[in-house]
Amino acid sequence: MNYEVVIPAAGQGKRMNAGKNKLFIEAKGIPVIIHTLKVFENHDACKRIILVINEQEFGEFNTLLKTYHFKTPIEMVPGGRERQQSVFAGIKAAGKEETVLVHDGARPFIKREYIEQLVEKAKETGAAIVAVPVKDTIKRVQDGEIAGTIERSSLWAAQTPQAFRLSILMNAHLEAEAKGFLGTDDASLVEEAGGTVAIIQGDYQNIKLTTPDDLLVAEAILEAEKRNEHV
């Protein structure tokens, strides 16, 4: 059940309009990246965290890690220009466990139960992701007009973590690099390489903090969690 997790944290999150790495933004007084890291710090099966960063932000990340006193080993690795390159750098630093997870630094609300289901499924099948069924009606648009309505019963929104047998993910990244293929997530690289990826149904609270509105939602979730602790 043990695993390592790669957390890409090098992006600047331009849609957040924060003027800095969005992972340094605080939610309830604690930086977003710390909320995310604590999820894995509090899970005994997580044996190592590989944090992929912008080299220019090494000092800021190093200070945060010292301030919040993590017991789980955390290795900082320099990332690339694209998220895919950053994840590739992260998995190159992995290898102590057979299973590796990839998780967005800006998704601090993944629950342990889904991580555990995901790791078990990945051990069984080689690759698995957390996802949720699409709730909204999806339109295909061309030149500013609706060109069709997509049947949503088979549509799922991919989230992270995404879990893989390390050899499968490494081979998928190597093939993508050789082809010049740039995927939208790591599962898409495995698909492109001819592999199959299983689905674990997660929940809609596992949001990625992308815009200022998402921070308001995050604050509300954290406030609700705090209240529940005292019930």
UniProtKB/Swiss-Prot annotation:
Record-marked site positions (Positions MEP for the nucleophilic attack): R152, K208
UniProt keyword annotation of Ubl conjugation present: no
Pathway: Isoprenoid biosynthesis; isopentenyl diphosphate biosynthesis via DXP pathway; isopentenyl diphosphate from 1-deoxy-D-xylulose 5-phosphate: step 2/6
Top-level EC class: transferase
Keywords: Isoprene biosynthesis, Nucleotidyltransferase, Transferase
KW Nucleotidyltransferase (keyword) present: yes
Site (Transition state stabilizer): R15, K22
Catalytic activity of the protein: 2-C-methyl-D-erythritol 4-phosphate + CTP + H(+) = 4-CDP-2-C-methyl-D-erythritol + diphosphate
GO biological process: isopentenyl diphosphate biosynthetic process, methylerythritol 4-phosphate pathway
Molecular functions per Gene Ontology: 2-C-methyl-D-erythritol 4-phosphate cytidylyltransferase activity
Pfam families: IspD
EC number: 2.7.7.60
Taxonomic superkingdom: Bacteria
InterPro entries in alphabetical order: IspD, IspD/TarI, IspD/TarI_cytidylyltransf_bact, ISPD_synthase_CS, Nucleotide-diphossugar_trans
Function: Catalyzes the formation of 4-diphosphocytidyl-2-C-methyl-D-erythritol from CTP and 2-C-methyl-D-erythritol 4-phosphate (MEP).
HAMAP family the record matches: IspD
UniProt record similarity statement: Belongs to the IspD/TarI cytidylyltransferase family. IspD subfamily.
Record protein name field: 2-C-methyl-D-erythritol 4-phosphate cytidylyltransferase
